[in-house]
């Protein structure tokens, strides 16, 4: 496991922080099919989504609906960029920005758990998930992932560090979901697209 610590000024857009942006791009360069369910204005991944319709993302669905749509269409992603709201307050702010009513379930841990379950369903053995937040929970052993790299970015003052994790899937999850569409390893022919993600500034 590789562990690094760097310093950078904070930004409301995670990937505009230079060391974090480079962390993401280093994995995108190796990816054929990538997914970003919380993309905001970044069109770096093959498939991008953000709940806010005023962003540049390709889709504007609830993150769980977006991930389930990809699963149901047979999409296999060798890389998922998982940068959700980091706290219940941030979830509430995101929903309020688009005029959506915030429920207790939205601000409880179940949202994060459901998102991770859905991510695991589109990532094959050998696939990578990049997780961002204030802790190192990540996808975890529950979803059969191992940690490859941790980058801690200090922002100084009273700001929380941003913790960036790269994890690799080591096995399927058995009968939790019909994962027959994930029998190919990352690096095999990907479906439905072999497009390499184009990095937009």
Model-found features: residue ranges?
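Class I S-adenosyl-L-methionine-dependent methyltransferase catalytic core
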Residues: 1-201
């Amino acid at each position: 496991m590789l562990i690094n610590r760097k310093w950078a000024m904070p930004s409301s857009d995670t990937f505009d922080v230079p060391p974090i942006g480079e962390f993401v791009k280093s994995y995108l360069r190796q990816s054929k099919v990538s997914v970003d369910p919380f993309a905001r204005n970044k069109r770096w991944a093959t498939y991008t989504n953000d709940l806010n319709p005023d962003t540049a993302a390709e889709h504007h669905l609830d993150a769980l609906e977006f991930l389930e749509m990809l699963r149901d269409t047979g999409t296999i992603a060798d890389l998922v960029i998982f940068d959700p709201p980091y706290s219940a307050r941030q979830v509430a702010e995101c929903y309020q920005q688009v005029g959506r009513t915030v429920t207790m379930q939205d601000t409880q841990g179940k949202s994060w758990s459901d998102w991770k379950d859905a991510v695991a369903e589109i990532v094959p053995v050998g696939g990578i998930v990049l997780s961002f937040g204030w802790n190192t929970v990540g996808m975890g052993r529950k979803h059969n992932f191992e940690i490859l790299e941790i980058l801690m970015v200090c922002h100084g003052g009273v700001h929380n560090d941003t913790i960036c994790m790269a994890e690799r899937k080591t096995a399927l999850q058995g009968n939790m979901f019909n994962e027959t569409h994930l029998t190919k390893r990352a690096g095999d022919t990907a479906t439905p697209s072999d497009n390499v993600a184009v990095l937009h500034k």
